């Protein structure tokens, strides 16, 4: 007969009687399944899970219980707000002997999406969008937020104006003594000197955080990122041929933007469609060794912060 294994978390008391705000594990690998309109895929995620430990005499929590509950998160139906709440409730219930009343979960993963080329038919590639889900159940109050990051290209409006001026001056100098200008000669000049100067542009990123209600059928991540990319107009591309690169250059020319413009575009596009969208954009400047950044939030959130202050 095998002897019972000791469990010091039950048989020993904490030497210092201090409650702990959170205890748990982080960086747990697991598969998750996302099922949304137009999207169904199993993805690799990393999870952080914690419960509170208010009982000062309890030496430790039961991490194996939390691990087992997390391992059952993928039930084949797809991750949803209600499924996440059920997990948090089960985490609390599994630690009643620790007087636990709160639980939280953080999931990090990449939303992997197949994106077609801009104009060339039959070619496409994969884009990944980093996602972070934060869920908590504190005092029976459930909260869930999603943060997703999307890459795009930004071309500086000021630099574009300076570029146009140089091209204009070069054209005027080249044809200063011409009474009539032949179209063919103008075309030839533009082919050679149209890039006399070029505006600076750079890869940029937008990180958006939204609240997700528990009664929504899914997380709505693909819909969110599609709204972000449509608002900006210049999402970074995957597979391209020359025609697609030309189309991308045209999109950049039609969507000149400062970091302020990008933040405002996204905020306007998301406000009223998603709950409490918070926008952070970053332009990794090619002109400077530093980044340009901007933040935006709904007006009601700004007012609430001012009142709280």
Curated annotation (Swiss-Prot):
Keywords from the UniProt entry: Hydrolase
One biological process term in Gene Ontology: tetrahydrofolate biosynthetic process
Enzyme Commission code(s) on record: 3.5.4.16
InterPro entries attached to this UniProt entry: GTP_cyclohydrolase_FolE2 (IPR022838), GTP_cyclohydrolase_FolE2/MptA (IPR003801)
Site (May be catalytically important): 156
Cysteine-cysteine disulfides: none
Superkingdom field: Bacteria
Residue intervals passing through the bilayer: none
Family: Belongs to the GTP cyclohydrolase IV family.
Physiological role: Converts GTP to 7,8-dihydroneopterin triphosphate.
Protein name: GTP cyclohydrolase FolE2 1
Organism: Cupriavidus metallidurans (strain ATCC 43123 / DSM 2839 / NBRC 102507 / CH34) (Ralstonia metallidurans)
Gene symbol of the encoding locus: folE2-1
């Amino acid at each position: 007969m095998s002897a019972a294994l000791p469990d010091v978390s039950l048989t020993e008391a904490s030497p210092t009687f201090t409650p702990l705000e959170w205890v748990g594990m982080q960086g747990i690998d697991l598969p998750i399944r996302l099922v949304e309109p137009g999207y169904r895929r199993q993805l690799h995620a990393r999870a952080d899970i914690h419960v509170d430990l208010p009982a000062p005499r309890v030496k430790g929590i039961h991490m194996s219980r939390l691990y087992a509950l997390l391992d059952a998160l993928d039930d084949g139906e797809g991750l949803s707000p209600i499924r996440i709440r059920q997990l948090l409730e089960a985490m609390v219930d599994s630690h009643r002997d620790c007087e636990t009343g709160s639980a939280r979960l953080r999931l990090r993963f990449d939303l992997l999406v197949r994106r077609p080329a801009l104009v060339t038919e039959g070619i496409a590639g994969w884009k990944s969008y980093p996602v972070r889900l934060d869920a908590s159940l504190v005092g029976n109050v459930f909260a869930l937020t999603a943060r997703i990051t999307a890459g795009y290209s930004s071309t500086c409006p000021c630099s574009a104006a300076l570029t146009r001026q140089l091209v204009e001056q070069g054209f005027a100098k080249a044809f200063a003594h011409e009474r009539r200008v032949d179209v063919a000669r103008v075309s030839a000049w533009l082919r050679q000197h149209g890039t006399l100067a070029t505006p600076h542009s750079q890869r940029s990123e937008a990180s958006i955080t939204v609240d997700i209600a528990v009664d929504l059928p899914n997380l709505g991540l693909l819909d969110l990122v599609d709204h972000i990319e449509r608002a900006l107009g210049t999402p970074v591309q995957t597979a391209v041929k020359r025609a697609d690169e030309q189309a991308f250059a045209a999109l950049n020319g039609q969507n000149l933007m400062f970091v302020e413009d990008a933040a405002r575009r996204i905020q306007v596009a998301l406000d009223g469609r998603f709950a409490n969208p918070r926008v952070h954009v970053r332009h990794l400047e090619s002109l400077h060794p530093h980044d340009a950044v901007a933040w935006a939030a709904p007006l009601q959130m700004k007012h609430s912060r001012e009142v709280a202050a």
